[in-house]
Amino acid sequence: MEEMQILVPVAVKSKLTETLKTTLLNEIGQNISRVEHDMAQLEFEANGKLAEQAKINIQAVAPLRAQYEAQKARMQQVKDKLNADKEHLEKLAIGAELNRQPMNRIVTVHVGDDMNALTGGEMLDEDGKIIAFSN
């Protein structure tokens, strides 16, 4: 075997434009709304189930309440993270580079190739169009 094809990760960055900023802020806003809705739904369900459990076995209420509180705390952490992301994005200047989810590229390697030259790589896009590559 003299050659092999491998997947090499490529960093993807997006240049922040008004369009991208608006899109990302809208996505974050929708996610915050979804989490708030889920938290309200959890509160509603918890109140009903806790009241029902209190009628059956009052001693089982405390562990059940703790479960709901833990789940509510996890949801609050998600909401706090989303709000922090939103604040960070609002402060970013147009033209800033945002790290996005990396992609993979297929590279054919041969015996004796310099692995350092093959790894890495970066791609920059602006409004969905690739504008630059770098290694």
Where does each model-flagged region fall?
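Amphipathic alpha-helical coiled-coil segments
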Residues: 21, 25-35, 39-42, 68, ...
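Short linear motifs in exposed loops
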Residues: 133-135
